[in-house]
């Protein structure tokens, strides 16, 4: 593809910057009717209407029957202080390596993100962790969408496994404020403040602030994080709305690689043991997001929505990471990290109706600038930099670091996409989509001067159908393909080909008053997925191909206004097909997993009373390594429970326990040396005040 065409496509994708000209064409007297056909299953109670500039659209909500939206009230009731806590409420999700505690990482339907960068996730429809991003703070979250399968499109982006989209809180024109104060185990202190109000008849503002400090349950591993999220909504008239959302995050903690396995036992050493060096200090993660979206009614049943998001971040710090076990001496590798990311994204989409067709056409693009500089020194018999695995004593003199990796990556990507949902009959709905991507990727090795370039323009397609057997029962089928660019280089300094995928799903769903159930069979194949190199785990390597197929069940039950039950189960058979790896099993992906969560509310007419909740999560045996060790992370069951008492509409008290029975388990693993243990029993007590 010519450079000129590429530049034109990128410019087209950045067209939302011109959306400020829309008032001239927006007619306030002729705006679209609200969509009453939303069918995505809502877990919890949706308190605010979906914003089409931030979340999945009506086509995805109608056609992706295996998708779920987890609302804020259920996130609070379930004690979801981390993204992984929330994803336990949906089938087919498992925890992955958290990169020293510095990121959110998970697998969906057996497919994982890179061990270093983590699984991709979106915030308000924009990819939010391209390159890197710190763990999400729950204070800013309105809802979390898990969009599964080829029909789970988000502004043209599709993954046959699934995508996570976190929808942010936005301003309201009705004044409201809340403050939550939490104290818990390990001297954890947390404060959340949230206030929103109109500034005029057309302008509203919101400010969310969160601060958390904890001594942590791992020896010498503390945590400090701060989040400030201002937002503004401007509605000059009924047919036009602009929303700005900002987010500034600071995340400070020692880099923590967890614990090693002893004699093949992932739970052999005390889970509180820290094998780094307190003298390394903290690793500092800084992240800023600034986002502007707009929605305009352009007449009839047509609307135009678009936005631009700019994100910058940095991660810097030192660590002493487990490398090799010789007797009781745990050799360590000394490292430093200096990562910087600058990511600019934009999109625009025109959507509307033509008879029985719901059509959308969009353009999007991004510019990524990502630099990674590592220094390290490997241990040796002469200088093992060791620590006793059974009785760690700190204070070893760190070896002098040497240059290791110094890469600078740049990407330019432009996308055009279109989709059509055709209501063929009152029972049959069909949809199809096409996506054209044009990209350039350049990775420069600053140590050697070598430059790797990739230019391509792939096209992907997807198809889906839904048939209503009865008013309450529907069958669905979907097929689609996708691709994702990979970052980084292998042990030879060579960049990676993109990750590509094809997959289908078949399923049935039922929706009766207070009951939602869905059963789905999926079969997906991907190529080019990155995992740790079996020859040298300090580097990444692509898996030739990976296939995952399985069955998922998701169900929710609401009994009057008091009781709600959410349950899920997944059987996932994920296998790699690459002779370079000693095993065909996939890291941290269980055959069987599931959870159940129950919530009961008992409030009087003045909103006084109490709420009870309890849940169980099961995770089956998982591969803990892909080398020849055969390490297996044992299955576990984890319980949680909470009680909340509302003294009035404005004041409530809450006590909760996570890992109620203090199960000792391995949460995830990167290798036999880097296993992250699950947290012990954790108690939290909260006071919430609202106005």
At which residue positions do the language-model features occur?
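C-terminal beta-signal and adjacent terminal beta-strands/loops
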Residues: 4, 617-625, 644-691
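Repeated loop/turn-to-beta-strand initiation elements of outer-membrane beta-barrel proteins
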Residues: 202-205, 239-242, 301-304, 356-359, ...
